[in-house]
Amino acid sequence: MKKIINTIPENPAKLYSCAATVSKKGLISYRTRIVAISDKTIKMHLVHTSTTMMHTRKYIKLLRACGEKDIANIVETLYRMCIDHKAQDAVYNAEDGTISVMV
């Protein structure tokens, strides 16, 4: 049975049994920061490969399992917008609740 992390760690830890790592600062897949979380923004740099996209979906699942539903919803929205717009970068601004997609 796979070990599930019950809390998002302060320091980088493996995401389930993947080559990706997670921390309170976000998600790193193959040495590329995919999700960066700060007090004011959540940034996504989505590399459109099947592995990185799988890591992102697992990260969203982990956030929900840890009770971080609001952050999970924002990350999932950024993920879907990157896919829909065929973009690599999207940013959520917490101050005004806006999302910007860079195509």
Language-model segment annotations:
Residues 1-103:
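Terminal leader/tail segments of proteins
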